[in-house]
Amino acid sequence: MVLETLKQGLDSSQIHEALIQLDSYPREPVDLDASMVLIKFVIPVYPSLPERSKVILRRLASKSFTFLCQIVTFSRTISGRDGLQEIRIYQEILEDIISFEPGCLTFYLKASTTSKADRDSIKALFFGSKLFNVLANRIDMAKYLGYLRLQWKFLLESNETDPPGFLGEWLVSSFLLNPVLAADMLLGELFLLKESYFFSFQKIISASSLIDQKRLIAKFLLPYIQVIVTLENLNDVRKILRRFDLDKIISLSVLFEIQSLPLKEVIVRLMSNHSSTKFVSALVSKFADFTDEEVDTKTCELLVLFAVHNLNHSQREEIAHDERFLNGVTKHLGSNEREARERAMFIAKLLSGGHLKYESDFKINIPNVKFESNSDDKIIDFQSLKNPSICNTQTDVGKDKITEVSGHVQSLTLDCSDSDDEDENDEREIVKRIVFLKDLMKEYEKTGESRKAPLIPLLKQTVKLIRQKADFQLEVGYYAQGILSSIVCLNNEFDEPLFEQWRINALTSILVVLPEKVNGAINILFNSELSLQQRMSLLSALGLSARELRGLDDPTIVKPKFDFPTNRLPWDDQSHHNSRLVEVQESTSMIKKTKTVWKSRKLGKDREKGTQNRFRKYAGLFFYPLAHGWLNGIDVGTYNQLFKSHYLTTLRIIYSCANPVHDFESMTELMNHIISSAIEEGISLNKG
């Protein structure tokens, strides 16, 4: 009867009475039939309804998953310019439901405990992007995650004594929406906010499947903690991690991925002796292989941590006499690298209990933090976990303007002199106040209607913050991939004349500060849906970052210098080669005070040659994926010749920067083959 009444086109007071009747039903008040009537006859007038009626309508949706699903499904069928106003109404009510009704997820959960199909539908709607995709041009991902945080908060406060195991699966899906932003929202602003929330988080993980436990801890919790860990909160981090069964969750690959040495030590010290012996056996095998310097450094570091903290005297002696370990020592001693030989002897001396006589000042330093004996009894200080720091030629092709970096592009600066627009200046002030990378990333997540301001101020701030925080590798590394991906996928929506140059500058800054992120950049190049302009800009950034890492200067790249002192942790001190550079600078400043009588030209040449070559270590990461990409075939459509010419230019720049590198001959052979194929295809070689 109520549904038939609603179909007649009622006024607001009559609609209100009908909604009250629906809300009074004891069971699910809105089934499929009722949903369709409300969608067709009530929701279209939602903006004009009085607030009291809106509240009831939202409450009906919060009690009926069927109703919410039908709103989402119907919204997706609306298309075309004529439906623009209509879709906005449905978007408005959907956003109001998830923001003003924080208990809807909890209600749906309780109603679906016996049906896996229903649970999967809820997961797909909230955490599988179905709902977000409908709202995408109205709200950004950061705002959506904020709404999900409200839903999870209500769920935690509903005092479920035994959370169902599938909640861990839902939580994993929540993080996967945007791993970095979700970690900030859900961990930093909810689960690690106070003991009651963390206890619920702990119960959810404990009830989850082992694979979900590993993902929640290793893929989301540990990377987040790694960024916020300090000497002051290290004990609180230890008390958090000891709540979980790390022996089951932690693998050797996880330990290798962790860059924070103090966090690595905390995890090792929380592991049992039984698990430690298994890890050490695997580490000894890696030590014996010794194929990669970087992997070996981490292997030896972990061996020291386990030996010092988790192994007894007899276990250390057993390893010292292990045939694999002895073969590894022999292999290390035959290395041309002095540090490899020193590492092997340091560990051999440690495992032998000092009986091995070998004089050397070399040490593998570990934090070896001392915790108070009664510290386990103290509560976790969640306040200490607050994260304060997370933080050129032009070619017209049809209507698209393809910008390519060359030495003729004007020099760029970070000042505000290149715009007279007052609104842009206001936006610049807002962006300039961003000091944390997490806030920068939130700005990049803005899309559609939430993107109302020019992008150049944001790109400038990216250059400034990334280069300013160059010494904060953990923080920059945590946010870099998300920011890099967002920058590549930006469109010049406001037709800003220097947009591409600033995009390239921002990408170059990330790749120079964290060259290992080139893997992610190339993956985006090959596997993402990008426009021709986006691909060209990314290629330009790859070439320019290779040049800067090689020590070469380009006037198109902004390299701001900052007086940004860092209170570094005692185990995170600058490497010894930096101290040597300081000594040289001090000596130079003393020489300047004297009068120069005669100076050889060779002195100037030596100074030029002193430029540090950081590219050598990463040359293969830059060159080989691009080279093999060419060999696998490139086809971007109409402008394939233009793109391949720019691609080849980038590859030649990277190749020239790679010399000297140990496999330069194989690079040369591959490069010659690529150039030959380019000549056969008629690709221009006279650029670059």
From Swiss-Prot:
The keyword Nucleus applies. Present with 638 molecules/cell in log phase SD medium. GO terms for molecular function: Hsp90 protein binding; telomeric DNA binding. Component of the TTT complex composed of TEL2, TTI1 and TTI2. Interacts with TTI1 and TTI2. Changing residue 129 to R: In TEL2-1; short telomere length. The modification Phosphoserine is found at residues 417, 419. It is found in: Nucleus; Chromosome, Telomere. Belongs to the TEL2 family. It comes from Saccharomyces cerevisiae (strain ATCC 204508 / S288c). GO terms for biological process: 'de novo' cotranslational protein folding; positive regulation of DNA damage checkpoint; protein localization to chromosome; protein stabilization; telomere maintenance; telomere maintenance via telomerase. Keywords: Chromosome, DNA-binding, Nucleus, Phosphoprotein, Telomere. The lineage of its organism: Eukaryota, Fungi, Dikarya, Ascomycota, Saccharomycotina. Part of the TTT complex that is required to stabilize protein levels of the phosphatidylinositol 3-kinase-related protein kinase (PIKK) family proteins. Required for telomere length regulation and telomere position effect. Regulates telomere length and participates in gene silencing at subtelomeric regions. Binds to telomeric DNA repeats. It comes from the Eukaryota. Coiled coil: none annotated. It holds the Pfam family Telomere_reg-2. The gene is TEL2. This is Telomere length regulation protein TEL2. GO terms for cellular component: chromosome, telomeric region; cytosol; nucleus; TTT Hsp90 cochaperone complex. The keyword Cytoplasm does not apply.
